[in-house]
Regions:
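Active/binding-pocket-proximal capping segment
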Residues: 349-358, 435-436, 497, 507-511, ...
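The conserved cystathionine-beta-synthase
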Residues: 465-488, 494, 511-516, 520, ...
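Bateman (tandem CBS) regulatory domains
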Residues: 450-463, 469-476, 508, 519-531, ...
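Alpha-helical transmembrane segments and immediately membrane-proximal extracytoplasmic
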Residues: 1-451, 455-461, 465-474, 478, ...
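Juxtadomain coupling helices with adjacent low-complexity linkers
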Residues: 572-599
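Generic long, charged, amphipathic alpha-helical segments
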Residues: 360-382, 512-532, 536-539, 543
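Short hydrophobic beta-strand motif reused across regulatory alpha/beta modules
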Residues: 394, 501-509, 567-575
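Hydrophobic, well-ordered secondary-structure elements that form the walls
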Residues: 344, 387, 415, 457, ...
């Protein structure tokens, strides 16, 4: 019986394989992404309008949607009461509306994507922006981006549910809505797409990437008549940076990375402290609101979104003492408020605190413009806290349009991520999911099962038995430890010419033995003749798909032109050996062949 096969992959096989798996349905997803992008922009406008309405009503006791600035204002004890009232409202909304509105939105979006088949309750689409507007409008030290990501994602999910789509396609449209929201709020379509890739999609496929990009671009276009055009935080452009400046960018990145670790630890320490309180979580946001109000008495810059403060940091307007005060006050108030389970985003507070770290280092060293180092600190703290360095550097670039700062932004963001991945096992976003028992691996790599062929791991001397052999005879050979058949859970059945006729498994043997028919039953009669097979040039991924579809643990490997000609045997152990081989490549240290050639 022939058992040899070539390791080379025929051209006709590689010719039908492609770099990406996609089909024409990507065009349908792109078409659906267009209205989702427009909806994301409109929802962003509504959220910003709601924040202004609640801020005017809460602090100035007037009905208006005019943008207002809380920084520099003094509200006395009324300024302490307002965040408490806001916290009470949010607690009631979460208790009797939907608990999903608690938190800053991105972990909830991740949970819906990974565990909820990308299905989001319509109540969340309504309650999340309203609760966030109440939180921020009553002084909450949060940004609008987390809630708008969750809200945009909710609308994307709801829209997708109107059509016959797979869960994977719904995920694409959910993320498209999230990216559209971020693109519209900040006029940062590239950063929105990068955030989707680094944080939300968990894949790099045209099916998902292209529709998300379409939604982000559409949102940025629709944004213009709604929210205006141009960079959100225009700054004086900086010149080309020298080697010394780039070295300082690494210092800022390391400092921001350490700050990221400290802030993450502080947030979850506060969350743990609230969890120990002897009353229902519905009341926690009100207690967090008390911390907000008291913090506002000390430094009013901790109140609200604080975009004016962020812009001031980018322009280098703060002295060292003011930066230290801002960093401590904002860090404490934000951590306590977020730990209380209220509603609001993390991005704007992180920008403010990262900017304070960078500007402070710039002032202390006296190198260049403190505003530049504030920008580097902002990119770095995003890269460190959210583990999204590409998003961090491009986000600041799109906010300012200062393209000469890109090398410094890149160095700072990557340096911060390096620090946090060494110090912390998880980011501020994934830690919340881990506390619910859900671990997320965010590393992308080539699937070893897509890369390796069946011929790389198959048994080239497959276990075989003649079709007329009795079950009793085969059972005796296995019991004696006959190496030709004892090492596998299945044995291939061959006819007189050595051609594949069937397969018999250990469970088939046990059924016949228990029935007392072993001496009168042949292996061909006891086994299966309705065979699923694979080929030596098939990928392990394809072979595994066949196993899963047929609910079997082993496959005969046959010639592609003659499916009765056996060339090998593939079992679960062979597949696991492929995974082990890739693991050894990651962990085994050895010298390369170049040293051997020089001896």
């Amino acid at each position: 019986m022939p058992t040899a096969t070539s390791d080379s992959v025929p051209h006709h096989v590689t010719d039908r394989l492609s770099d990406f798996s996609t089909n024409r349905r990507v065009l349908l997803l792109c078409a659906l992404a267009v209205p989702i992008g427009a909806i994301g922009a409109v929802v962003s406008k509504v959220l910003i309008w709601l924040i202004a309405v609640f801020t005017n009503a809460a602090f100035f006791l007037r009905l208006s949607a005019e943008p207002v600035v809380l920084q520099g204002q003094h509200f006395g004890w009324w300024g302490v009461a307002v965040p408490v009232i806001g916290g009470l409202i949010i607690g009631l909304m979460a208790r009797y509306g939907s608990e999903k509105i608690r938190g800053h939105g991105i972990p909830e979006a991740l949970e819906a994507i990974l565990l909820g088949r990308s299905l989001i309750n319509p109540k969340v689409a309504v309650l999340k922006p309203v609760s966030s507007a109440v939180s921020i409008g009553t002084g909450g030290p949060f940004g609008a981006e987390g809630p708008i990501i969750m809200t945009g994602g909710a609308f994307g999910s709801m829209f997708a549910q109107l059509f016959h789509l797979t869960a994977a396609e719904r995920k694409t449209l959910l993320v498209a809505g999230a990216a559209a929201g971020m693109s519209a709020v900040f006029a940062t379509p590239i950063a929105a797409v990068l955030l989707a890739v680094e944080l939300l999609l968990f894949e790099w496929k045209p099916r998902s990437f292209i529709p998300v990009a379409v939604a982000a671009v559409v949102a940025s276009v629709v944004r213009v008549p709604l929210l205006g055009v141009g960079p959100i935080f225009p700054v004086a452009l900086h010149g080309q940076l020298g080697a010394g400046a780039l070295g300082l960018a690494a210092v800022v990145g390391i400092a921001a990375g350490l700050a990221s670790g400290a802030l993450t630890a502080l947030v979850y320490a506060c969350e743990d402290a609230f969890a120990k309180l002897p009353f229902h979580w519905m009341w926690w946001p009100a207690l967090g609101g008390l911390a907000i109000g008291l913090g506002g008495l000390v430094d009013s810059r901790v109140l609200g979104v604080g975009y004016e403060t962020i812009h001031g940091l980018m322009r280098g307007e703060f002295l060292a003492t003011a930066l230290i005060s801002l960093l401590i006050a904002k860090g404490l108030v934000w951590s306590i408020a977020l730990g209380s389970g209220t509603s609001g985003g993390v991005l704007a507070p992180l920008l403010m605190m990262g900017g304070a770290v960078g500007a402070l280092i710039g002032l202390l060293t006296g190198v260049g413009d403190p505003g530049l180092w504030a920008m580097v600190g902002m990119a770095a703290i995003m890269g460190g806290t959210m583990r999204s360095p590409l998003t961090g550097m491009i986000f600041i670039l799109e906010l300012t349009h200062d393209f000469n700062s890109l090398p410094a932004l890149m160095i700072g963001s990557v340096s911060a991520m390096c620090v946090t991945v060494l110090l912390l096992r998880r980011s501020i976003l994934t830690e919340k999911l881990a506390r619910r028992g859900q671990h997320i691996a965010r590393e992308y790599s080539v699937d070893v099962f897509e890369l390796m062929r069946v011929s790389d791991v198959m048994d080239r001397t497959p276990p075989t038995v003649s079709a007329d052999t009795t079950v009793a005879a085969l059972a005796n050979r296995i019991a004696r430890g006959d190496p030709a058949v004892a090492g596998r859970q299945g044995t291939l059945v061959v006819d007189e010419a050595g051609a594949l006729a069937g397969i018999i498994t250990r469970s088939d043997l046990m059924d016949v033995l228990q029935a007392g028919e072993a001496d009168r039953t042949t292996v061909l009669d006891a086994g299966s003749t309705d065979l699923a097979v694979t080929h030596a040039d098939a990928t392990l991924h394809d072979a595994i798909a066949v196993m899963l579809k047929r609910d079997i643990g082993r496959l005969p490997v046959v010639d592609r032109d003659n499916e009765r000609l056996i060339v090998g045997y593939l079992g679960r152990a062979d597949i696991l050996a492929a995974k082990l081989r890739r693991q050894e490549e990651e962990e085994k240290r050895e010298r390369g062949p170049i040293l051997q050639l020089t001896r």
